[in-house]
């Protein structure tokens, strides 16, 4: 199969950045993947000339010089110092975008491809710099690592672009089991150095955020492309900020707690009367709702000793978590 133009140009840049000296056109033809496809020297020369012009048009500093004092042949290389970018000031959104691209490039699939290209150059006798002195691309220190999430991040981004629903295992915390979620994805956002998927949770029929580090690796697109509609004017960053905020949203939950148990919830709430439920004496408390996911997790942790009376959305969320712990589906 013929090598694509983009792949050939990338191979050429890797080769010319990695070589210590100048590479002759003959060495490039024999060792850089994509040029051996040329059937004749003339065809190679035309292709190589076009590629050199394209690199220069892209602003890549291609240098021409003698191979050595003993070999006056003309060769080529890319000066790393001239190739490197000057310091760049990025906005938080720009830094996040660069971090995504950088960490996708650092994924095992692309690392393997890059190392494979360098090994082929070595095998062809090209004198290149050691593997421990690579060209470095730095990401923003304010953006958390995606390590462990790179594989499925590309699937999520593809699904967002094609407006397709996804299915994946998710756990709200490491102490809880994974449950399968069906989501219409709207976008990926960073907040407080963490990565979140925002979308419509089909199982809960509500807008939800999902921290990428808590998504299992088995992410798969489901349903037809084009089926997902992102609401007009939706503010993904605001959704994430509200979901992870510790401040009160102004909403209140009413929760029944059995006497003598669920002490942490009792201390966090305000007494709102006594009530007997399921044959057990208890107390009704009112709790401010900051993050509904966090509150649902806290309440579910007390099992049958805490029961949500209202709102319905919080009660449903707690029931889903309890059923997941019990290993049963929705009833």
From Swiss-Prot:
Pfam families: WYL (PF13280). PROSITE patterns: WYL. InterPro entries: CBASS_pafABC_assoc_protein (IPR051534), WYL_dom (IPR026881). Residues 145-225 form the WYL domain. It comes from the Bacteria. Interacts with PafC; with which it probably forms a heterocomplex. Does not seem to be involved in pupylation or substrate degradation. Belongs to the PafB family. This is Protein PafB.
